[in-house]
């Protein structure tokens, strides 16, 4: 099974880390789809719900390190939304473990790769998105 993971990345840090991982030829699963956001503070729970509805197996939200958000508190707002999304996904029977928030700087390509590998391993244990069977 090749799990599909949607990574919502802030332009300043998360996307920079993903880009650096790519230009450094670091290896991570090719089934990760990156959606660039101006800031993770722009992330909305409906983005995750739509991703799961369309067949994603997991969602990552990748923002700046705490205290280093270019928009001051955007990453903290996203963290709250992800926490709520976890509860909602549990209630819906999809599973809150299918979404997580990661914090890193643009220079931490290795941390991006580790986060992707962590989510991939998690999805392999959980199995495919239960909505795919419907």
UniProtKB/Swiss-Prot annotation:
Keywords, ordered alphabetically: 2Fe-2S, Electron transport, Iron, Iron-sulfur, Metal-binding, Oxidoreductase, Selenocysteine, Transport
Enzyme class (EC, first level): oxidoreductase
Required cofactor(s): [2Fe-2S] cluster
UniProt xrefs under Pfam families: FlpD
Signal sequence coordinates: none
Comment on bound cofactor: Binds 1 [2Fe-2S] cluster.
A molecular-function term among this protein's GO annotations: metal ion binding
Entry keyword annotation includes Oxidoreductase: yes
E.C. numbers: 1.12.99.-
Subunit structure: The F420-non-reducing hydrogenase vhu is composed of four subunits; VhuA, VhuD, VhuG and VhuU.
Family membership: Belongs to the MvhD/VhuD family.
Designated name of the protein: F420-non-reducing hydrogenase vhu iron-sulfur subunit D
Phylogenetic placement of the source organism: Archaea, Methanobacteriati, Methanobacteriota, Methanomada group, Methanococci
């Amino acid at each position: 099974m090749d799990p599909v993971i949607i990574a919502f990345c802030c332009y300043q840090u998360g996307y920079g880390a993903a880009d650096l991982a790519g230009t450094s030829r670091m290896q991570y699963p090719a089934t990760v789809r990156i959606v660039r956001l101006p800031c993770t503070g722009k992330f909305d729970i409906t983005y995750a719900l739509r991703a799961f509805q369309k067949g994603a197996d997991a969602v990552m939200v990748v923002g700046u390190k705490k205290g280093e958000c270019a928009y001051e508190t955007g990453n903290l707002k996203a963290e709250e939304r992800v926490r709520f999304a976890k509860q909602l996904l549990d209630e819906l029977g999809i599973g809150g473990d299918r979404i997580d928030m990661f914090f890193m700087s643009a220079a931490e390509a290795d941390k991006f790769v580790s986060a992707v590998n962590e989510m991939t391993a998690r999805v392999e244990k959980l199995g495919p998105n239960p909505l795919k069977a419907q």
